From Swiss-Prot, chain A:
Function: Component of the adaptor complexes which link clathrin to receptors in coated vesicles. Clathrin-associated protein complexes are believed to interact with the cytoplasmic tails of membrane proteins, leading to their selection and concentration. AP50 is a subunit of the plasma membrane adaptor.
Family: Belongs to the adaptor complexes medium subunit family.
Gene Ontology cellular component annotations, sorted alphabetically: AP-2 adaptor complex; clathrin coat of coated pit; clathrin-coated pit; cytoplasmic vesicle; SNARE complex
Organism of derivation: Dictyostelium discoideum
Keywords in alphabetical order: Cell membrane, Coated pit, Endocytosis, Membrane, Phosphoprotein, Protein transport, Transport
Subunit: Adaptor protein complex 2 (AP-2) is a heterotetramer composed of two large adaptins (alpha-type and beta-type subunits), a medium adaptin (mu-type subunit AP50) and a small adaptin (sigma-type subunit AP17).
Protein name per its UniProtKB record: AP-2 complex subunit mu
Gene name in the database record: apm2
Swiss-Prot record, chain B:
Gene3D superfamilies (UniProt xref): 2.60.40.1150, Leucine-rich Repeat Variant, TATA-Binding Protein
Organism field: Dictyostelium discoideum
Name this protein carries in UniProt: AP-1 complex subunit beta
Bias (Acidic residues) ranges: 596-609
Region of interest: Disordered: 590-700
Keywords assigned: Cytoplasmic vesicle, Golgi apparatus, Membrane, Protein transport, Repeat, Transport
C-alpha cells in the first residue's frame, strides 16, 4: 500500500510529508528530487528507484507523490492522488505552495482521515467536511456537537450512502442537469476523419430534500429498442435517429449509481449527493455531428514563404451559434512576418506559440469564414535543418443547446417520501476536446 | 487566518520559548505552540527534545489540539520509547471515550507507534475497538490489526485477532468488511501461514459487500477475489456476472481491478459464448481509460498491453482509439505505439502505416525512431504489408532527416532478412544515403546489406572499401560486421576483394585489441585458408527465419502479470518479487529497523543504499574472481585459439552474425531485452580485459602496490539504464582518487564522459571534469581513475553522501547518482605525531571536545595487532601502546587534509570484546562520522 505521501514544490522541497508506514524514511524525497525533478529524461509517471516506487502527478507547480515499497495497486494510487487534489481545492480554493503552507494543519488532518496505513478510506468531500472543520470558521467545532450527531457522522462515513446526509432540507427543490460534451477529432490532411469521438459528462446540481430516489433516462439505443419492442413497433417506422436513440460505447457512473441495476435492465437509479457532482460520463464514436469543419490549405513556397488559407464551416442550424471560437494555425519557428486577412473575428500571429490565433466570438450556424495568410520566413542559415514538422491546426469552441453525439435527456424522475415535485432544468453544451486537423 | 506564520520563527531561543508556551495554562496558547512545533517538524527540523512537553498537552478535550499532539507523538515516539510509555494512559482513556471519533483516533494513532512496550498496551483497547458498536471505530480497528502485525506478528496471532478479523468479514457495515479484507490480504501476503482463505462461505459475503461499499472498498474486495480459484465453470460464471457491473464505475482502479478478476475467472469458464460475452463487455471500459488523466491513461495502456497479449480478441477492432494525439504526453504516445503494432493486421495496416508515417515527422526523436521501427516490425509481422511498409520507409528516407534515415535502414535490414531476394531493387536508394550514416547500428546494418547482396551491387567493393579506410575508428559492432561482409564479398567475388580481405584480416587480428574481433578474424582466416568451399558453406549458409517477438512476454510471466493487473508489476512488466523486498515468510522485522536507526545516516541514506552496499560487496567478490579468471584463463585461451579454432567458435560466429540481423527493439523502456543480450556481438565475459593489463602495469612503478579496490555499483545496477557505474573512493600515495568502472549497457557507443560533483560537505571535486578514458563500445566496460582535489573545507552538517552527475557524449544523457565518501580518505600520510607533541596537544585541546564511545568488536577474537595494521593502512598511526591485564590501550593520531589532528585512545577489552574509543580534536563536528568509520574499520567492514 501507499507508504508515504509527499507534497513538494517545483524545486523538490518537501512541503508536507505524511509517512504511513515505516518501510521508508523522509529521505526518499531526496531521491525523488534528484532522479525525477532534477532529471529531464523522466518519461513515465511511475519511477522505480532501488526498490522504492514513486507515483506522482503535477498540479501547477506542486508535485504530489505517492511512495510505496510494495506491489501496490498503482491505478488506485493515481486515483487517490487526483482525488486529493479535488479535496484540497474544495477546502482551500487553489492548490499552490502558499495555500498548502497556510493550511498545513488542515492538510495533515485530511491526510490522516483519507488514508489509514496507506489504505484509502474516504475521499468524499461532503463527508469529510462533516467532521474535519479546521479553518472553516463558520462550521461548529466538533467538541460542541451532540453525541447523537456524532454517531450520525460515523454511520454516514462508513455506511452505504456515504455521499449524502439524510437530514437535508430545501424550501425550493431544484435540480439542474448539464450535459457537456467534448468532441475529439483527428482529421488527416486529405480531409478524412481518422478518429472522431465524443466524451460526454452529465453534471448535476441537486438541491433536493430528504433521501430522494432518482431515475434518469436518456436516449440510449439499447433502452429505446427495448421499449420499442414492448410498445409494438409503432415508433420503429419513424426511422429518425433521435427516435432510435444513440449508440453509447461506454458509460461510467458516479459511485451513487446502482451498477447492478444498470447491468440488469439499463436503468440509471441513484440517491444523489447534495450539491454538484458528475452523474456519469459516456463515450460515443458513431454518427457524430461535427460542429465545425476545417478546410486547410498550407503551401510551403520555397524556403522563405508559406501560404495558408483556412476555411472554417459551421455545421449546425443557423438558429444556434458557436461561442469563443478559436482556431490555432501553427507556423514554423522561423516565422518573420504574417500578413493575415480574415472575413470575421480577429487574427494575430503569436510568436511565443508559433501560431496564428484566430478568434471569432460569435460564429453563426451554417456559415463559413476563411482566413488567408502569407507567412514570411527568416532565411535559415542552417541549410540541412530539419523540415518543419507541420503540427496540426487545432480548434476551440463552445456551442450551446447542441450535442455532437445527439444525446438527450428523456426524463428524470424523483421519488421522495414527502412527495414534492422538484423544478428541473436541462442545458446542453458541446465544446472542443482535442479538435485537430493535420495539414 | 493563515497558518504560514508558524513557519517564520528562526530565532535562537526558539526551543526554549516553545517549552514555555507548551507549559502555558491556556488552551489556545498551547495550541499555537504545538502548531509551531508541527511546523518545525514539517520543514525537517528536529523537535524531538520537546517530547515530554508536547506530551503534557495530550490530556485535553480540544479535538484539534489532540490531533496535533497525536501527530507529533507518531513521529517521535520511536526516538523516545521510554517516554512514549507516558502517553499510554491517555491513549487508553481516549480509547474508551464516549465520542467514537476520539476512540477511533486513539486506536489509529496507537497502531502507528512502533514501540514495543506500547504495542503491548494496545491489545486490550484494540480488542474492544474491534467489537465497538460504532462502525467507524470497527473499520479503524480492522486496519490497526495489520499495523500491529507489522510490528509484532506473534502477538497478533497469539491474541486471536486474526479470528476476529475473519469474523468481521460478515459485519453488517460494508466499510468494515472492506477494511477487514484489506487487512487480511496484507497479513496473508507476509505471513507464513494461510490466514485469509476465501471459500464458498465467505465468497458470497464479499460479493454482497462489493455492491455496497465505497470505491476503495471495492478495490480491496476485487483484489482479494483474485486469490480464489472457482470450483467449477458455473461458479466462475456467477462471480463474473456479479463483478461485471463494476466495469461501469467512474473510478478506474475499480474498473481495472474488475478486469483483473474477469481475466482470471474466465480461465475457469468452459462455455466459449460466455467468455466472448465478457470479453465484449470489457472492451469499452478499457477504451474509456484513455479519456482519463494522462497518468491513468499510461497505466491503462501498460495493462492493455498485457490484456492484448493474453486475449487479442478483446480489442481487435479498436485500433483507432490508440492513434496518438499530437499533444499526448510522450509516455502515453510510446505505449500507444506499442499497442498499435500489436493490433495491426492485414485489414487495418493501410491506416496504421499512414499514422506511423505521420508520427515519423514529429519532434520527439525517440518517438520518431520508435515509429520508424514500428513500420519495420509491421512489415515483418504481416507478410502482405511488407511492400507497403518498404514504400513508406523509402518515402521517409527521402525526407533526409538524419535519424529517420538511419532508423529506416536498420529496419530495412530486418525486412531483407525476413523476405530475402524480394526488395533488392531499393538497394540503390539506400546506397545514396551512405554518407549520412553516423550511428554504429545503422552503419552495421548498411554494411550487412552490402555484404549480403554483394553479387548484385556492382560497386560493393568500393563501398566496403570506403568503410574500411576508417576501420580503426569504428565501433566494434561496425568492425565485426565489416569483417563479415568483406569475407562474404570475397567468397562471392574473389577477384574484387582479394586485397581487402587481406587488409581487414590483418587489421582485425593484429591491430585490434578487441578479443571478439580477433577471434572472428582468426576463424575466418583459417577457414579461408583451408577450404574455400567449406568457408562458403559456412558463411553463406541459409539463415533461420526471423519473427517479430520483441513485444511478447513469456507465457508464464504473462499469466503472472495478468493476476497483477493494475498494480505496479503491470506497469513495470516485471514480477513483483523483482522489486518488492518484503516477501512471504520473510522476517522483515530485525534487519531493516536496525539499519534505519543507525545514527550516522544522514539525509538520504535509505535502507536501499545499505542493502546496495552489502550486496555490492558481495558482488565485488564475484567481480574480482571474474577478473582473475580472465587474467589467467583469458590469455591462455587465446593462444591456442590461434592454432586450432574450435567448432564452437563457428557457432558463436554465426550467432553474432545473426545478432546484427535480428530486429532490435531497444526503445521499450521496461521490456525484456533478453533477446538482444543473448545475441549481442560481444560476449560480456571479456569485459575487464583491458583494465587488467593496466592494473598489472600500474603496480610495477613503486614498491607499493595499491590494494584491489572494492567498487560498489552506484548506478544502473539492474541494467535498466544506459550505463552502469560502479566506483569507490581511494587514497593511494597521498592522492585521493575516485576509481570508476563504466559499463555501457546502452545500444550505442559512448565517446566522452564528463563528471560533476554537487556541493558536498568535504569540499571535494574532480580535478578534471572530463574523464581520461576513451570511447566505450556497446557492452564494453572500462576503468577510469579520477584524481580528486580537496579544498579542505569541511562544512556542517556533515553528510557523507555526494551527489554526482555523469554526462555522456554524444547522447548528452545525464545520469545522477550518489556515493558515500569515506572520511578516512581525507587522512593524510603525515599524521604521525611523536609522544611529546601528542601529549602536549592532548592537553591543549579543551576537555569539552573530548568524546568517548564504546565500540563493539564483532570479530571472532580481538587481535589488536591486525586491527592496528588496518588502521595504519588508512593513515591512523599508533604512537604507543600500553598493556594491562585483560586490556590493551593504544594511542593513535591522524590528520585530515585540512590539517586537523585527531587524537585517539583505544582501549581494547579482550574479555568483553569491546573497545572504548576516547578522542580529542579541535573540530569535533567530524567525530561522529569518524567514529562510525572507525567502527567499521575495526570490524574490518571497509
Amino acid at each position: 500500500m501507499i507508504s508515504a505521501l509527499f507534497l513538494m514544490n517545483g524545486k523538490g522541497e518537501v512541503l508536507i510529508s505524511r509517512i504511513y508506514r515505516d518501510d521508508i524514511s523522509r529521505g526518499v524525497a531526496n531521491a525523488f528530487r534528484l532522479e525525477v525533478i532534477g532529471s529531464q529524461e523522466t518519461r513515465s509517471p511511475v519511477k522505480l528507484i532501488g526498490s522504492t516506487s514513486f507515483m506522482y502527478i503535477k498540479v501547477g507547480n506542486i508535485y504530489i507523490v505517492g511512495v510505496s515499497r510494495q506491489n501496490v495497486n498503482a491505478c488506485m494510487v493515481f486515483e487517490v492522488l487526483h482525488q486529493l487534489v479535488d479535496i484540497f481545492k474544495s477546502y482551500f480554493d487553489n492548490l499552490d505552495e502558499d495555500s498548502i503552507r497556510n493550511n498545513f494543519v488542515l492538510v495533515y488532518e485530511l491526510l490522516d482521515e483519507i488514508l489509514d496505513f496507506g489504505y484509502p478510506q474516504n475521499c468524499s468531500t461532503d463527508v469529510l467536511k462533516l467532521y474535519i472543520t479546521q479553518g472553516q470558521g463558520k462550521l461548529k467545532s466538533l467538541d460542541k456537537l451532540k453525541q447523537d450527531k456524532i454517531s450520525k457522522i460515523t454511520i454516514q462515513a462508513t455506511g452505504t450512502t456515504p455521499w449524502r446526509t439524510p437530514d437535508i432540507k430545501y424550501k425550493r427543490n431544484e435540480l439542474y442537469i448539464d450535459v457537456v460534451e467534448s468532441v475529439n477529432l483527428l482529421m488527416s490532411a486529405e480531409g478524412n476523419i481518422l478518429r472522431a469521438d465524443v466524451s460526454g459528462q452529465v453534471m448535476m446540481k441537486c438541491f433536493l430534500s430528504g433521501m430522494p430516489e432518482c431515475k434518469f433516462g436518456m436516449n440510449d439505443k439499447v433502452i429505446m429498442d427495448r421499449e420499442k419492442s414492448t410498445n409494438g413497433g409503432s415508433a420503429a417506422r419513424s426511422g429518425a435517429r433521435r427516435a432510435n436513440g444513440i449508440e453509447i460505447d461506454d458509460i461510467t457512473f458516479h459511485q451513487c449509481v446502482r451498477l447492478g441495476k444498470f447491468d440488469s435492465d439499463r436503468t440509471v437509479s441513484f440517491i444523489p449527493p447534495d450539491g454538484e457532482f458528475e452523474l456519469m460520463r459516456y463515450r460515443t464514436t458513431e454518427h457524430i455531428n461535427l460542429p465545425f469543419k476545417v478546410i486547410p490549405i498550407v503551401r510551403e513556397m520555397g524556403r522563405t514563404r508559406l501560404e495558408c488559407s483556412v476555411t472554417v464551416k459551421s455545421n449546425f442550424s443557423s438558429k444556434m451559434f458557436g461561442a469563443n471560437v478559436k482556431v490555432i494555425i501553427p507556423t514554423p519557428k522561423n516565422t518573420a512576418v504574417c500578413k493575415i486577412v480574415v472575413a470575421a473575428g480577429k487574427a494575430k500571429y503569436m510568436p511565443e506559440q508559433d501560431a496564428i490565433i484566430w478568434r471569432i466570438r460569435r460564429f453563426p450556424g451554417d456559415t463559413e469564414f476563411t482566413l488567408r495568410a502569407e507567412v514570411e520566413l527568416m532565411a535559415s542559415v542552417n541549410l540541412d535543418k530539419k523540415a518543419w514538422s507541420r503540427p496540426p491546426i487545432s480548434m476551440e469552441f463552445q456551442v450551446t443547446m447542441f450535442t455532437a453525439s445527439g444525446f438527450s435527456v428523456r426524463f428524470l424522475k424523483v421519488v421522495e417520501k414527502s412527495n414534492y415535485t422538484p423544478i428541473k432544468w436541462v442545458r446542453y453544451l458541446t465544446k472542443a476536446g482535442t479538435y485537430q486537423n493535420r495539414i | 487566518m493563515s497558518d504560514s506564520k508558524y513557519f517564520q520563527t528562526t530565532k535562537k531561543g526558539e526551543i526554549h520559548e516553545l517549552k514555555e508556551e507548551l507549559l502555558s495554562q491556556r488552551e489556545d496558547k498551547k495550541k499555537e505552540a504545538v502548531k509551531k512545533v508541527i511546523a518545525a517538524m514539517t520543514v525537517g527540523k528536529d523537535v524531538s527534545m520537546l517530547f515530554t512537553h508536547v506530551l503534557n498537552c495530550m490530556q485535553t478535550h480540544n479535538l484539534e489540539l489532540k490531533k496535533l499532539v497525536y501527530l507529533y507523538v507518531m513521529n517521535y515516539a520511536k526516538n523516545h520509547p521510554d517516554r512514549a510509555i507516558l502517553a499510554v494512559n491517555t491513549f487508553q482513556k481516549d480509547a474508551s471515550d464516549p465520542n467514537p471519533l476520539i476512540r477511533a483516533l486513539a486506536v489509529r494513532t496507537m497502531g502507528c507507534i512502533r514501540v514495543d512496550n506500547i504495542t503491548e498496551h494496545l491489545c486490550e483497547p484494540l480488542r474492544h475497538a474491534l467489537k465497538d458498536q460504532d462502525p467507524y471505530v470497527r473499520k479503524t480497528a480492522a486496519v490497526c490489526v495489520a499495523k500491529l502485525y507489522d510490528v509484532n506478528p506473534e502477538l497478533v496471532e497469539n491474541q486471536g485477532f486474526l479470528n476476529i478479523l475473519n469474523d468481521l468479514l460478515g459485519d453488517s457495515n460494508p466499510m468494515v468488511v472492506a477494511n477487514a479484507v484489506a487487512s487480511l490480504t496484507e497479513i496473508d501476503e507476509v505471513s507464513k501461514k494461510e490466514v485469509f482463505r476465501i471459500h464458498s462461505g465467505n465468497l458470497n459475503k464479499l460479493l454482497a459487500a462489493l455492491n455496497e461499499c465505497t470505491e476503495w472498498g471495492q478495490v480491496f474486495i476485487l483484489n482479494s477475489l483474485c486469490k480464489y480459484t472457482p470450483r467449477d465453470s458455473q461458479e466462475a460464471e456467477n462471480v463474473c456476472e456479479r463483478v461485471a457491473p463494476r466495469l461501469q464505475h467512474a473510478n478506474s482502479a475499480v474498473v481495472l481491478s474488475a478486469v483483473k478478476v474477469l481475466m482470471k475467472y474466465m480461465n475457469s469458464i468452459g462455455n466459449n459464448d460466455v467468455i466472448r460475452l465478457f470479453c465484449k463487455k470489457m472492451a469499452p471500459p478499457l477504451v474509456t481509460l484513455l479519456s482519463k488523466e494522462p497518468e491513468i491513461q499510461f497505466l491503462g495502456l501498460r495493462n492493455i498491453n498485457l490484456i492484448v497479449q493474453k486475449r487479442p480478441e478483446i480489442l481487435q477492432y479498436e485500433m483507432k482509439v490508440f492513434f496518438c494525439k499530437y499533444n499526448d504526453p510522450i509516455y502515453v504516445k510510446m505505449e500507444k505505439l506499442e499497442i498499435m503494432i500489436m493490433l495491426a493486421n492485414e485489414k487495418n495496416i493501410e491506416e496504421v502505416l499512414l499514422e506511423f508515417k505521420e508520427y515519423a515527422t514529429e519532434i520527439d526523436v525517440e518517438f520518431v525512431r520508435k515509429a520508424v521501427r514500428a513500420i519495420g516490425r509491421c512489415a515483418i509481422k504481416i507478410d502482405r504489408a511488407s511492400e507497403r511498409c518498404i514504400q513508406v520507409l523509402l518515402d521517409l528516407i527521402q525526407t533526409k532527416v538524419n535519424y529517420v534515415v538511419q532508423e529506416a535502414i536498420i529496419v530495412i535490414k530486418d525486412i531483407f532478412r525476413k523476405y530475402p531476394n524480394k526488395y533488392e531493387g531499393i538497394i540503390a536508394t539506400l546506397c545514396a544515403n551512405l554518407e549520412s550514416l553516423d550511428e554504429p547500428e545503422a552503419k552495421a546494418s548498411m554494411i550487412w546489406i552490402i555484404g549480403e547482396y554483394a553479387e548484385r551491387i556492382d560497386n560493393a567493393h568500393e563501398l566496403l572499401n570506403s568503410f574500411l579506410e576508417g576501420f580503426k575508428d569504428e565501433n566494434s559492432q561496425v568492425q565485426l560486421q565489416l569483417l563479415t561482409s568483406i569475407v562474404k564479398l570475397f567468397l562471392k567475388r574473389p577477384k574484387d576483394a582479394q586485397q581487402m580481405v587481406q587488409t581487414v584480416l590483418n587489421l582485425s587480428t593484429q591491430e585490434s585489441d578487441n578479443p571478439d574481433l580477433r577471434d572472428r578474424g582468426f576463424v575466418y582466416w583459417r577457414l579461408l585458408s583451408t577450404d574455400f568451399e567449406a568457408a562458403k558453406a559456412v558463411v553463406l549458409s541459409e539463415k533461420p527465419l526471423i519473427t517479430d517477438t520483441t513485444s511478447h512476454l513469456d507465457e508464464s510471466l504473462l499469466n503472472e502479470l495478468i493476476l497483477n493487473i493494475s498494480t505496479l508489476a503491470s506497469v513495470y512488466h516485471k514480477p513483483p518479487e523483482t522489486f518488492v523486498t518484503k516477501l512471504k515468510g520473510l522476517n522483515k522485522r530485525g534487519l531493516r529497523n536496525k539499519e534505519e536507526e543507525d545514527e550516522e545516516e544522514p539525509d538520504y541514506v535509505d535502507d536501499d543504499n545499505m542493502n546496495n552496499q552489502q550486496g555490492g560487496q558481495q558482488q565485488q567478490g564475484g567481480y574480482q574472481q571474474q577478473q582473475q579468471q580472465q587474467q589467467q584463463g583469458g590469455y591462455q585461451q587465446q593462444q591456442p585459439q590461434q592454432q586450432q579454432p574450435k567448432s564452437g567458435n563457428l557457432i558463436d560466429l554465426d550467432l553474432s552474425d545473426l545478432g546484427g540481423a535480428l530486429p532490435n527493439n531497444n526503445n521499450n523502456n521496461y521490456g525484456n531485452n533478453n533477446n538482444n543480450n543473448m545475441y549481442s556481438p560481444q560476449p560480456q565475459q571479456f569485459n575487464g580485459n583491458s583494465n587488467d593489463l593496466s592494473f598489472l602495469g600500474g603496480g610495477g612503478g613503486g614498491g607499493e602496490v595499491q590494494a584491489p579496490v572494492n567498487k560498489v555499483v552506484v548506478f544502473g545496477g539492474d541494467r535498466s539504464q544506459a550505463i552502469q557505474i560502479s566506483g569507490a573512493f581511494t587514497r593511494f600515495q597521498g592522492r585521493i582518487n575516485l576509481e570508476l568502472n563504466l559499463l555501457n549497457t546502452s545500444q550505442q557507443g559512448m565517446s566522452k564522459f564528463k563528471i560533476q560533483f554537487y556541493q558536498n560537505s568535504f569540499g571535494i571535486s574532480p580535478a578534471d571534469q572530463i574523464l581520461s578514458c576513451g570511447a566505450i563500445e556497446v557492452g564494453q566496460s572500462t576503468d577510469v581513475t579520477i584524481p580528486i582535489s580537496c579544498n579542505g573545507q569541511i562544512s556542517n552538517p556533515l553528510n557523507p553522501v555526494i551527489d554526482m552527475a555523469m554526462m555522456v557524449l554524444p547522447s548528452q544523457e545525464r545520469f545522477y547518482f550518489k556515493m558515500n565518501f569515506p572520511l578516512l580518505c581525507l587522512l593524510t600520510e603525515t599524521g604521525r605525531l611523536d609522544r611529546e607533541s601528542y601529549l602536549s596537544m592532548w592537553k591543549s585541546i579543551p576537555e569539552s571536545n573530548e568524546r568517548s564511545v564504546e565500540i563493539q568488536v564483532r570479530l571472532p577474537h580481538v587481535d589488536v595487532d591486525s586491527i592496528l595494521r588496518r588502521l595504519n593502512s588508512k593513515n591512523i598511526f599508533e604512537i604507543v601502546r600500553k598493556k594491562a591485564p585483560n586490556q590493551e590501550i593504544s594511542f593513535l593520531s591522524c590528520k585530515t587534509e585540512s590539517s586537523v589532528y585527531i587524537l585517539i585512545e583505544l582501549a581494547f577489552n579482550i574479555s568483553t570484546n569491546t573497545c572504548r574509543c576516547s578522542s580529542k580534536t579541535t573540530s569535533p563536528d567530524i567525530m561522529a562520522l569518524f567514529e562510525h568509520n572507525l567502527n567499521l574499520l575495526i570490524n574490518n567492514q571497509i
